[in-house]
């Protein structure tokens, strides 16, 4: 029994030295990573940086756009229902209330 194990190890040892990449063929480390860094560098230069540039252009063009008029207030019965007051402030304003954009149940505060 011991001689069979010894002979098997003698046969497998040279194979392991000759083919180191085939030792664990299903592991993720078996594949070469020489192209991985080059791929991520190319993605950074050709996808990410132009994407940031397009986003900056979009913000610039939107900032130069004229202001729109506020739509007239229509008191729809299914919107802005207050069954109990909010636990902050006067209880009628939402947490991130903007008086120029968000109307109260009675209308805009500015009008």
Curated annotation (Swiss-Prot):
Q: Tell me one Pfam family matched here.
A: COX6A
The record's statement on gene disruption is: Mice have walking difficulties. Histologic examination shows thinned sciatic nerves and neurogenic muscular changes, including small angular fibers and small group atrophy. Electrophysiologic studies show delayed motor nerve conduction velocities compared to controls. COX activity and ATP contents in liver cells are decreased.
- InterPro entries (UniProt xref): Cyt_c_oxidase_su6a, Cyt_c_oxidase_su6a_CS, Cyt_c_oxidase_su6a_sf
What Gene Ontology molecular function terms does this protein carry?
A: oxidoreductase activity
**What Gene Ontology terms describe where this protein resides (cellular component)?**
mitochondrial inner membrane; mitochondrion; myelin sheath
Mitochondrial intermembrane topological domain residue ranges: 62-111
Q: Which domain of life is it from?
A: Eukaryota
UniProt cross-references to PANTHER family, sorted A to Z: CYTOCHROME C OXIDASE POLYPEPTIDE VIA, CYTOCHROME C OXIDASE SUBUNIT 6A1, MITOCHONDRIAL
Name assigned to this protein:
Cytochrome c oxidase subunit 6A1, mitochondrial
Task: Name the species this protein comes from.
Answer: Mus musculus
Q: Which gene encodes it?
A: Cox6a1
């Amino acid at each position: 029994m011991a001689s069979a194990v010894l002979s098997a190890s003698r046969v497998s040892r040279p194979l392991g030295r000759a083919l180191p990449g085939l030792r664990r063929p299903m592991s993720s480390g078996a594949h070469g990573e020489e192209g991985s860094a080059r791929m991520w560098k190319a993605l950074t230069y050709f996808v990410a940086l132009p994407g940031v540039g397009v986003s900056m252009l979009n913000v610039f063009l939107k900032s130069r756009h004229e202001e729109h008029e506020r739509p007239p207030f229509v008191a729809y019965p299914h919107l802005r229902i207050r069954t109990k007051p909010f636990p902050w402030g006067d209880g009628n304003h939402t947490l991130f209330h903007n008086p120029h954009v968000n109307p109260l149940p009675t209308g805009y505060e500015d009008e």
